[in-house]
């Protein structure tokens, strides 16, 4: 399978938002995150299926990227992620 460039993904996300609407895509995002939660719970119980987990994480990530596009918050999300990773690094180093 060929890797899809970020710019092409963004075009597809925009097309999905235009076709299905922001409200529908927000609901789908919630559903996909719930499916990740379900797979993590299964893993905790010792019933991990890595393929299912990977698929659900991919689905949720796609939907979260649409949310970033929908609200125009990509730059903000990147900045907050950098700050949170730095805070995590400091916490690890201090413990």
Feature locations, PLM:
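Flexible "arm" and connector segments at domain edges
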Residues: 1-95
């Amino acid at each position: 399978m060929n890797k899809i460039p970020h710019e092409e993904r963004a075009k597809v996300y925009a097309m999905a938002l235009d076709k299905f609407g922001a409200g529908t895509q927000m609901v789908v995002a919630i559903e996909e995150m719930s499916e990740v939660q379900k797979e993590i719970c299964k893993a905790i119980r010792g019933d991990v299926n890595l393929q299912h987990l990977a698929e659900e994480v991919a689905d949720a990530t796609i939907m979260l990227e649409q949310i970033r596009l929908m609200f125009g918050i990509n730059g903000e999300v990147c900045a907050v992620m950098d700050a949170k990773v730095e805070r995590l690094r400091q916490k690890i180093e201090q413990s």
